[in-house]
Each structure stands twice: as structure tokens, then as C-alpha cells.
Amino acid sequence: MELNTLKSTFINNFGKEPNSLFFSPGRINLIGEHIDYNGGFVFPCPITLGTFAAATLRDDRICRAYSLNFESLGVIEFSLDDLSYKKEDNWTNYLKGVLKVLIEKGYKIDKGIDLVINGNLPNGAGLSSSASLEMLIVKILDTFFSLNISKVDAALIGKEVENTYIGVNSGIMDQFAISLGEKDKAILLDCNSLYYEYVPLNLGDNSIIIMNTNKRRELADSKYNERRKECDDSLDTLKKYTNISSLCELTSLEFETYKDKIEDSNKLRRCVHAISENERVKDAVKALKENNLELFGQLMNQSHISLRDDYEVTGKELDTLAENAWKQPGVLGARMTGAGFGGCAIAIVNNNHVDEFIKNVGQAYKDAIGYEASFYVASIGNGPTEL
């Protein structure tokens, strides 16, 4: 259905059939939150919700782009000769950003494209719609221009676009999880070294439920950059006493020795979260490999509590979802996922209890918050693909 809409929209806007169709997933992070920029381990996986594209290579230097998610903007047109950021160009700044970074890196891109996209990720829900779009664009350009970009390089290019062009100080996790995604596997990623390992997601007779607060979160102007600065400031202080390049190089035991050097109580709590969360990721992956799903779920719960109390990035909406999820029968664990401040939480729920879970948590959320949450049963899909 989505592909038919995509094709007909392409024909309506550009007067011809598209050459190619593509898909790029969104992602959830099972555990390891707000530590990708602190040199920690994360454990994300791609989901089957994501961003679809229809695209055709042009024979001039013009790009024309249309999004079914932002129909009121119409077709946005620009030239490869002017890839400067313009606020009014909205989502196409991601397209311009990827083009600019690739061209600056010496990749030969000398023709424009016609592009229609349609995403079924809830916008602003913290499921990485922007990284999904970046990896989609890299995949399209890689395919059209035979650029031979590795999956790891694709992720690094997306991160560079985010940091230097869009102006969001994000880590590597989202792009990496999407670019290197494989069906039914999560990725244990060391964000310091980019060492990674695929771990089969054997959840037995349980499913991952995505719970969307339907409270939009805007990464760029949320407290995300503030948290990053608190961590960077703490790292600068700790570097005077110990030879580390990121917070997550310390164990909780080692941090005990140095924690009195962090005088600001807020910054101290940020460090406690980062260092303990990194240890939780390692413990959680070990538990999953040993088929100890109960422990995996408990670690998810502990992660949410740390994000709530020490990192302070959850808020009433996410806490309402997680805390009500914990009370339900058949629930192994639940936590916020993504950057927080709204967005989504996830829960691992026994298949026999899914309907009851959605009903009960949904009602509790509506009673407490005043509007409805949305629920999705997550499937773990592949990375960016040409369809």
C-alpha cells in the first residue's frame, strides 16, 4: 500500500515513474541510554517501521524532493551548487547535508535526484526518524553513483551531517543501529572504538511493545545538549586525576575513588548514570546470551530508574508508561528508549498478555496524562535496502 502511494505521488509530482524504491528502518535501543556520547556500550536494533523512498537520477544538477509527511511544503527544489542550510527547506536539509558531506569527502556526485519519501515512524517519537532519513539518503546516493560506501562509513557520514550541518550534538548509535541492522538481531556497540557484535534477539514467547507518549520531543532544543555539556565538564574534571578519554572507561568501583572531585551534585548524578548504565548493558547482553530474560528485564527497569532519578530525562509521560508497565502481568521489563523528554518507552511482554497490557497501560496513561498513548508490537528488521 505504502509503495503504491509512493509511486503515484512520484508520478503526480514529477510526471514519470521512479527508477528505484528504497527503505530505511527506525531503531529502538534496548538498553544503554545517553551513553553513546560518553564512550559506552549500547544495545540497539532496527525496527520494521521506517522511511520509504522513490527516487530517480536526473541528468542535471537540480534536486527536487517531496515528502508525504510534510505535504504542505510541496516540492522543494535546490541545486548541487548551493547546499547551504536553509531553515525553510525543512526536512530536505538532511538531503542537502548528506550531499554536502559526501561531496566534501571527495565522492563524485555530479547529478541531482528527484525524490519522494514517506515515513511511518511517528515523527518526534524518538525512534530516530532523522537517522533513518540520513541512512536512506546515503543508500540512495551510494546506489545511484556506485560510491561503495561501507555500512560503518555510512553511519559516520550520518553522524557528521547531524553534528556539523544540522547542529545536533548526537552520538553514533542511531545511524550505526540502522546502517548495520540485521533482521532479528540487536547490535552490541562500543561507541568509543566502534567494535560491534550481533546478538540474536531470542525473546522466547515475548514481544517488544513500543509505547509512544505522543508527546513530541525535539532533540535539538531539548535538554539533550545540556546533558552532554554536564558530562563533558565532568570528564574534563576527571581527566586531571585519571587517564581516561570518556566517562564510561571507568567502572563504578573506580569512580568511587574520584567522585568527590565532582563538586556539582547534578553533574555527579549524571556521571553515576553513565557509568552504571554502561555496566548494565554488559550485564544485560550476558543475561540475554544465557537466556536469563528475567534478569534482562530487571536491568531494563533499573535503567529507567537511573534515567529518571540520576539523569533526569524521562518526565511525567514516560514515567507513567514505564511505571504502569511494571505493574502488569507478563511484563519482564520496561524503560524509556531514545533521548527522553517525551518520545517512546519499550516493554518486553509475554505474548499471552499483550492485549491486556495495551488496554491497562493505555487506560492508566489516559487517566494520568489526559490524552492517549499509541502502542506498536515491534518487529526487528533489516538495515537500509533497495526494494
Curated annotation (Swiss-Prot):
Native source species: Clostridium perfringens (strain SM101 / Type A)
Function comment: Catalyzes the transfer of the gamma-phosphate of ATP to D-galactose to form alpha-D-galactose-1-phosphate (Gal-1-P).
EC number: 2.7.1.6
Keywords: ATP-binding, Carbohydrate metabolism, Cytoplasm, Galactose metabolism, Kinase, Magnesium, Metal-binding, Nucleotide-binding, Transferase
Gene3D superfamilies: 3.30.230.10, GHMP kinase, C-terminal domain (3.30.70.890)
Protein name, per record: Galactokinase
Domain of life: Bacteria
Residues engaged in binding substrate: E33, H34, I35, D36, Y224
